[in-house]
Amino acid sequence: MNNALSVTVGGGGSFALVVKSDHSLWACGINDRGQLGSGTTQGSAEYIKIMDNVSKAAAGDKFAFAVKQDGTLWAWGANDRGQLGDGTTIDRLSPVKVADGIADTNAYYALTTDGRMLEIGNGFAEAATGVSRILNGSLAIMTDGSLWSCSVEYDDYYITDDAISACEDGEANCYVIKTDHSLWLTEMFSEDETSSGTEIAHGYKDVASFEIDYDGGWPGFVLLDADNVLYYLDYIDGDGNLQLKKIADNIAAFAFSSVTVENDCGTHFCIDTSGQLYAFGKNYYGVFGKGRTAGYSDTPVTVAFPN
């Protein structure tokens, strides 16, 4: 069974984790700190099975997490800063159980089944309550649909209402998709707490940011529209119009790493509406699963799994 439910890419595109439709977890790529969870530090240019009964996986820099269907959270990889949440600073080459009662995770925060957002690498300290979904980083959607940036060390910050997806741009701005599929640009930490931002487009259901310049760290964006067409957002012109570059049709989900749109500095994945997984960009670490660590593709190519 090769259908994919979700994919996450870590380490700047150096490794990838895929949850298949049978809830098995597969990994591929570089493995110098055990980030594949295979029990060794040997990398793989073919996908290898790591564990079963997984509902969600999240990849960090050189570490990763998985939530199992029984609500347990598992962690592996680099742990020099205690980022795995296991109470040690010892790297883990195989998954270790670090928490119970978990509904979701990203690379830094876990969401409990009772709606608490916990910072994994900070002793599972509570960052927020009443959370419905966690997005990337510190962004969270509350049970009332409001979008917040949450933190253990700092005050939680309200961003806007009626959100279904959002991402930050690294410059204190946030792209938000609302329940009516409108796309908004909102200034975070604005002194004008009455402003909900500026509506810039309509007809989208997911948005994500990705790094497009290693030196400056400037972000780019990708959009999935209501018709399941995946686009790069190149820029917004002076009249507020989106300048888009289509990537693929019939896409249900995606994962992006560092990239410049016109060259080969990124590794990306998308899953079509039938569950087929595709990769594009660079294959320098073998994450295309083709058995080699070379090559580049401007267009999505099929990712295969061993029988």
Language-model features and meaning:
Residues 1-307:
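Eukaryote-biased RCC1-like beta-propeller repeat architecture
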